[in-house]
Amino acid sequence: MKEWRREILGRELVVQHGKVAKQSSGAVLVRFGDTAVLATANISDKVIEGIDFVPLTVEFQERFYAAGKIPGGFIKREGKPSESAILSARLIDRPIRPLFPKKLRNEIQVIVTVLSADPNVPPDVVGIFAVSLALNVSKIPFEGIVAGIRIGYRDGQFIAFPTEEDIEKGLMDITVAGTKDAVTMVEGEAKEVSEEDMVKALRFAHSVIKELVDFQEEILSEFNVEKIPVVEPEPPEGLVETFNSLLDREELERRILVKAKKEREAALKEYEEKLLSQTAEALSIVDPEEIKPFVSELYEEAVKKTMRRLIVEKGIRADGRKPNEIRPISCEVGLFPRTHGSALFTRGETQSLGIVTLGAPMDVQIIDTLLEEGVKRFMLHYNFPPFCTGEVKPLRGPSRREIGHGHLAERALKNMLPPEEEFPYTIRVVSEILESNGSSSMATVCSGSLALMDAGVPIRKHVAGIAMGLILEEDAEVILTDIIGMEDHYGDMDFKVAGTRDGITAFQMDCKVSGVSDELLMKALMQAREARMYILDKMYETISAPRPHLSRYAPIIKVTKIDPDKVADVIGPGGRVIKKIIKDFDVKVEIDDETGLVKVVGNSEENVDNAIALIREIAKEIEVGEILEGKITRIEPYGLFIEVRPGKIGLLHQSKVGEDMRQFLKKVKVGDTIKVQVINIDDLGRLQFKRVKEESPQHGEVHNKRH
């Protein structure tokens, strides 16, 4: 067993190898502060045939014992990965995936298990460091060293590994990963920060990443691991030369420049099949399927080079646009009568339908994860059905990609929402992707913002998002605005920026090359800002402010405040009083027993108002001398029990009836109303009444005074 230690950012970073999980190809136990993770990396001996990608799976295992907790619910053990675990797995996957050899076809599984969790040192960020080491000490081919860090920005200062208070009171919460040379991955949110501050944050993050990478280099200098060879099947003799001689580059260029996505894909597929047939014929191969993998690879590379050359040399993109040109945009709101808010945002061949549903305060999402407990009142869910790309696939639960895209869009919008005190509704936004050709997560931000305003949610400003790309050659660099799927696939970087007219609210970047300079990143961010302003103008033209009224189908929520000491009176013995209010007025009621804040939800404004009036009446202090009207609930020889408010029952003694008791009892029965005056309240809060004479009691009638 070997152990290495180094102090970084005031915390001790400890790495152990050879102590646990020794049968794993690569395994390290990393402890940073009070957070400890075990990272393991293994590879299958078998090569998977017929695929054109690296078969990598990253799993992130949250163990509740790491935070000293037992899982909630009926089943007291961890089940399928939570959304937070899936997001953590994606966060680790993204910086390591580009560092595997492109031709590697053996299945790789990376597992990060959280053994101890410190809220101020995120386990997923430590996991990036641990996975990098586990892969490098394993036999798995891996070409680099990466590390990650979480950055906050508060009071003009950048903070590494910010506390929850720093995040809440600060302006930024981003996770950054990279190599010694450059930042390669960013994911996070901000409260309308400038492009300059974002670049400064990445620069600060990289200074810490370099120190973390340096520590890894020190550790790895003691290892000399033999990596397994990457098996690359040799093409038949003469195939490459034959293919290149048959390839008509002008014909390929014409097919790439077909504007519509489906037509372009069909044209390129047709030409690939033609080249496959011609190559097989030229090489006297009877079955073209024998050489299909080789031809497909050569063709893919030719398409990539041609598309990039068109952009760099001619400034023309596959759909005919210039590098900084945005596809045609259209916005619509108020599409459906029964939804609380709706919007359709279309950008070229990407289309998102945003739907807003307003719910009661009790509709919040309960959060009980490894490091978080509480409730979530704003949710954004992103759906990517197969028909949006014209494909046929089985419909299952949300994929990791759908969860990740929805999370990014949610972070982009959430800081524009009103506080709960101003708008007590639970808010759910659903984005249905109806068409997709690049940047559907940013289309979700736009449709979500439009739908929120259509629903009457008082968001402070519109938020728009744009996806940017980069083509980086030795002699040229071209930044692309509003990338399509093809440019995302063949480009060197894609980054998504969402924000208002005043700053960035969410940012995501993935770099396939060794990294980009601060100057180039700043240039790309400013180009993204121009695009964002253009989209925001279109959105403001469609709906410039939240609608003044909510949908008539949205629930009605009204809030009142009572004395916290009176909460028990409103609830009543065994909940009897509150249950009756809920049943009588067809409402939902939520009471905070610490603050006395009462929220009443219903579909009828009259019922909600009446319920609130009754709650206020119940919570109102009863004073000696006050005249009240109550209902007879019980008759005894010594007097009558009168309920003057729900749950508030007092005694009208026979001596206080004001006439002969036997004669009076002939005129009344249980359920009748009677007017009484409070003459005493004892130390236990028990009420004593005297009768206030009136002409005659109203049989069977109950008077509820409501204000």
Swiss-Prot record:
Keywords: Cytoplasm, Magnesium, Metal-binding, Nucleotidyltransferase, RNA-binding, Transferase. Gene3D superfamilies: GHMP Kinase, N-terminal domain, K Homology domain, type 1, Nucleic acid-binding proteins. Its cofactor is Mg(2+). It is an enzyme of class 2 (transferase). Mg(2+) binds at residues 488, 494. One of its GO terms (cellular component) is cytosol. GO terms for biological process: mRNA catabolic process; RNA processing. One of its GO terms (molecular function) is RNA binding. Its EC number is 2.7.7.8. It catalyses: RNA(n+1) + phosphate = RNA(n) + a ribonucleoside 5'-diphosphate. Residues 625-692 form the S1 motif domain. InterPro entries: ExoRNase_PH_dom1, ExoRNase_PH_dom2, ExoRNase_PH_dom2_sf, KH_dom, KH_dom_type_1, KH_dom_type_1_sf, NA-bd_OB-fold, PNPase. It is found in: Cytoplasm. Residues 555-615 form the KH domain. Belongs to the polyribonucleotide nucleotidyltransferase family. HAMAP family: PNPase. NCBIfam families: polynuc_phos, PRK11824.1. Involved in mRNA degradation. Catalyzes the phosphorolysis of single-stranded polyribonucleotides processively in the 3'- to 5'-direction. This is Polyribonucleotide nucleotidyltransferase. It comes from Thermotoga neapolitana (strain ATCC 49049 / DSM 4359 / NBRC 107923 / NS-E). The gene is pnp.
